[in-house]
């Protein structure tokens, strides 16, 4: 339901299909009759389906309805998890200590629930030995396998090879 719904005198249609506060259809009524019925019940006449023939109007407490709608929207936004992709850059000739540091960072990201993209950039003639980069990425994935699943296997993209790891349980 849109935020700018037509209410009471804002409704331009001459006739509306009327639904009361209990959800029962009262049939096609003139706008004036529908407004009078809504006024007697101390409620608002809200146009819920303006494109229908004739348009559908419902008798309800519009203020309460808007409040409930805002609460639902807020709850939906709160439950929405933003997926963050972190990147760890390696090289085909990475030293053991550097590898361990990068691995520790990646494990920290995975524990937080973030995805990790591990990339290796081949410089100069190193591109001729792609299998070395493949081994480094395989070793990296093997070291993290208790925390993650491999979302995308090692793949070449230009002068880079990358692998995407996703956490086992996203928090």
Swiss-Prot record:
GO biological process, one term: ribosome disassembly
Cysteine pairs bridged by disulfides in the record: none
Presence of keyword Cytoplasm: yes
Main location, first listed in the record: cytoplasm
Keyword annotations from UniProtKB, A to Z: Cytoplasm, Initiation factor, Protein biosynthesis
SUPFAM superfamilies the UniProt entry points to: Translation initiation factor IF3, C-terminal domain, Translation initiation factor IF3, N-terminal domain
Annotated localization: Cytoplasm
A cellular component annotation (GO) from this entry: cytosol
GO terms of molecular function: ribosome binding; translation initiation factor activity
Keyword Repressor set for record: no
InterPro entries according to UniProt: T_IF-3_C_sf, T_IF-3_N_sf, Translation_initiation_fac3_CS, Translation_initiation_fac_3, Translation_initiation_fac_3_C, Translation_initiation_fac_3_N
Function description: IF-3 binds to the 30S ribosomal subunit and shifts the equilibrium between 70S ribosomes and their 50S and 30S subunits in favor of the free subunits, thus enhancing the availability of 30S subunits on which protein synthesis initiation begins.
Family affiliation: Belongs to the IF-3 family.
Subunit text: Monomer.
HAMAP family: IF_3
Name of the protein: Translation initiation factor IF-3
Gene: infC
């Amino acid at each position: 339901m849109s935020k700018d719904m037509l209410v009471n005198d804002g409704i331009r249609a001459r006739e509306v299909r009327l639904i009361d506060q209990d959800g029962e259809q009262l049939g096609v009524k003139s706008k004036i009759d529908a407004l009078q019925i809504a006024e007697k019940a101390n409620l608002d006449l809200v146009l819920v389906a303006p494109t229908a023939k004739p348009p559908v109007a419902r008798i309800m407490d519009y203020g309460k309805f808007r409040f409930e709608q805002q609460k639902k929207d807020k709850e939906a936004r709160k439950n929405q998890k933003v997926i963050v992709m972190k990147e760890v850059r390696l090289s085909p000739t990475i030293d053991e200590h550097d590898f361990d540091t990068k691995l520790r960072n990646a494990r920290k990201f995975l524990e937080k629930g973030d995805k990790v993209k591990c990339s290796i950039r081949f410089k100069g003639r190193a591109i001729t030995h792609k299998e070395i980069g493949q081994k480094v990425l395989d070793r990296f994935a093997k070291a993290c396998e208790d925390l993650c699943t491999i979302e995308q296997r090692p793949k070449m993209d230009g002068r880079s090879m990358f692998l995407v790891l996703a956490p086992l349980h996203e928090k």
